[in-house]
Design a protein with these regions (language model features):
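Metal-cofactor-dependent catalytic cores
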Residues: 1-189
Length: 189
């Protein structure tokens, strides 16, 4: 049985965070707008002011990490990372992020596509002064593409989305966008 055939789980969006530019503290929001092709309104990657903005990738519009990973990091490695320190936009609970690569899923009314696993970076270690690189290998979160935009709120339900339930034009647009390298120019270019 494929992963998508057996996805019967339900998770929760615990926290939403954005940073206006690279290196500044993350700001926690009660709600945020996700914009297709852009990212999380007010976030450094939506405005192209992030550390990795020059390496833009269509699947890096919104980033997620599991609260269970943060718990394991503290338990197994003695490293405490608060939700505003991990530098991901969304903190989830009960969501199997590593299994969502290549899958569609809903966060509230929005639909995301799991593009690729997030890879830990030394930049985070330098920024925080905490040894997180090795402990976060293979569990650093998920980079996603926004397929259906809208508002999300802390407490929203997260669940797998059968791609057959999406409008065919949305699926085709998502697939076509994935082939673009780089995506169309940003408004300020």
């Amino acid at each position: 049985m494929g992963v998508s055939e057996g996805m019967h789980w339900q998770g929760e969006l615990l926290h939403i965070h954005v940073a206006a530019k690279a290196g500044v503290p993350m700001l926690q929001l009660a709600e945020a707008r996700l914009t297709t092709g852009i990212g999380v309104d007010g976030d450094r990657y939506a405005t192209r002011l992030g550390t990795y903005s020059k390496k833009h990738h269509i699947d890096r519009q919104v980033t997620l990490i599991e609260s269970e990973t943060l718990d394991a990091l503290a338990r197994d490695h003695g490293v405490e990372l608060s939700p505003d320190e991990h530098r991901r936009n969304l903190t989830t609970r009960g969501v199997p992020l590593n299994h969502l690569v290549g899958q569609y899923f809903r966060v509230g009314a929005c639909v995301l596509y799991g593009g690729r696993l997030n890879v830990p970076c030394r930049y985070l270690e330098e920024l925080l002064g905490k040894k997180v690189f090795k402990p976060l290998l293979n569990r650093s979160g998920l980079n996603c593409r926004i397929v259906v935009d809208g508002m999300i709120r802390a407490g929203d339900r997260i669940e797998w989305c059968d791609p057959r339930s999406l409008d065919v034009s949305l699926r085709r647009a998502n697939e076509a966008t994935a082939l673009e390298r780089p995506p169309q120019a940003w408004p300020d270019e």
